């Protein structure tokens, strides 16, 4: 149904006249891929189709074929090591923590400040606050101390009804959960450790190439400061002489689409 809507209402194209490029999540089961293929050929009569892994397209969009992609969207985050265009499935890690959880967490900590956000409409407001005002601290404890001793980190936000709210340490406490999932009561490792674990599951000969090409992708990697913090945290985990580079392309929110566009025009 959603594909039908996309073809006929949004794109307004005849699917039988165009080859189709579909994307899939890392570790997508073979049955899903078969079903996608069946629908494209049998329902829409596509002349040709290809299914690409989202993280691989993000890597292509950054102009690379080897690297590790940290892809974090609304529902799930993945770390995907890729060597010469091929994802390495045995080393892919999944983290059930992403944008939606951060919005929920921000709703919770704003409630502690005395603001009440409960309805779906209010949730959208909190998502907007998250996208506009949140950032990742380079040193969380130090930032907490700064926030406690001065109002320099405070920002105000005007709600649709004209009420103005002030947000302080919530600005960086919210995305900190990506590095410390314990904030959300989760026992999993943060995105820095997950990336490190992915690299360590790869052949020792390619680790150097992965450390030097850590590519961020997806809307939940859009927080200011996230690349520097990632660099700092991975450097702490990695061997001392290792060169580590985190790449955060400005268009990373749409890098899967951009990579698909590149692949489709080859």
From Swiss-Prot:
Reaction catalysis annotation: ATP + H2O = ADP + phosphate + H(+)
EC number per UniProt: 3.6.4.-
Enzyme class: hydrolase
The keyword Nucleotide-binding belongs to this UniProt entry's keyword annotation: yes
Keyword set, alphabetical order: ATP-binding, Cytoplasm, Cytoskeleton, Hydrolase, Nucleotide-binding
Keyword ATP-binding: yes
Any coiled-coil regions, as ranges: none
Alphabetized PROSITE patterns for the sequence: ACTINS_ACT_LIKE
Highest taxon, organism lineage: Eukaryota
Functional note: Actins are highly conserved proteins that are involved in various types of cell motility and are ubiquitously expressed in all eukaryotic cells.
Protein known as: Actin
Species this chain originates from: Crassostrea virginica (Eastern oyster)
Lineage, highest ranks first: Eukaryota, Metazoa, Spiralia, Lophotrochozoa, Mollusca
């Amino acid at each position: 149904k959603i594909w039908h809507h996309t073809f006929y209402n949004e794109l307004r194209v005849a699917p039988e006249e165009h080859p189709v490029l579909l994307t899939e999540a890392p570790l997508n089961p073979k049955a899903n891929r078969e079903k996608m293929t069946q629908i494209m050929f049998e329902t829409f009569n596509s002349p040709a189709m290809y299914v690409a892994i989202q993280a691989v397209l993000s890597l292509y969009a950054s102009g690379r074929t080897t690297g590790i992609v940290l892809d974090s969207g609304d529902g799930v985050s993945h770390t995907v090591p890729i060597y010469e265009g091929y994802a390495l499935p045995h080393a892919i890690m999944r983290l059930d923590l992403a944008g939606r959880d951060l919005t929920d967490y921000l709703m919770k900590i704003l409630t502690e400040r005395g603001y009440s956000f409960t309805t779906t409409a209010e949730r959208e407001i909190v998502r907007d606050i998250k996208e506009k005002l949140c950032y990742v601290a380079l040193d969380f404890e130090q930032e907490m101390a700064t926030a406690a001793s001065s109002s320099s980190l405070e920002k105000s936000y005007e709600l649709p009804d004209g009420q103005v709210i002030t947000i302080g340490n919530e600005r960086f406490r919210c995305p900190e959960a990506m590095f410390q999932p314990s904030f959300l009561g989760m026992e999993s490792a943060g995105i820095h450790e997950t990336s490190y674990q992915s690299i360590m599951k790869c052949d020792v000969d390619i680790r150097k190439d992965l450390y030097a090409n850590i590519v961020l992708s997806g809307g939940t990697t859009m927080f200011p400061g996230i690349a520097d913090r990632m660099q700092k945290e991975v450097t702490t985990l990695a061997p001392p002489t290792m060169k580590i580079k985190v790449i955060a392309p400005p268009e990373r929110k749409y890098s899967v689409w951009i990579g698909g566009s590149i692949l489709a025009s080859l």
